[in-house]
């Protein structure tokens, strides 16, 4: 299984889903810590989308020439087999905003 690092963007198979969970195979940002990723077969990801409304817990970004959002309200744990391929990684301010928003969500 390939290693995954915090901030990497992977194409992930999210189906099957239920109710309001975001679905399909789509880019997702790895948000679990590197030490956790190194020891577990699971990974925590935040899906990305180009078709959603902005909110304080949704981080805007441009990836592969497309405007989109990182949906921190839709984070989930996936088995590593759901990760299809590595597409890239977040950098600088976008990665910092993502991690800061997660911290604010869980440790207000």
Where do the protein language model's features map onto the residues?
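Conserved functional hotspots at enzyme active or ligand-binding sites that engage polyanionic ligands
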Residues: 1-108
């Amino acid at each position: 299984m390939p290693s995954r690092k915090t901030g990497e963007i992977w194409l992930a198979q999210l189906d099957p889903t239920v109710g309001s969970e975001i679905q399909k195979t789509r880019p997702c940002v790895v948000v679990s810590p590197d030490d956790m990723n190194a020891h577990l077969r699971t990974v925590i990801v935040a899906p990305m989308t180009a078709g959603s409304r902005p909110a304080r817990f949704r981080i805007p970004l441009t990836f592969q020439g497309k405007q989109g959002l990182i949906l921190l309200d839709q984070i989930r744990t996936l088995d590593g087999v759901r990760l299809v391929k590595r597409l890239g990684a977040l950098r600088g301010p976008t990665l910092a905003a993502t991690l800061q928003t997660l911290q604010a969500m869980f440790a207000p």
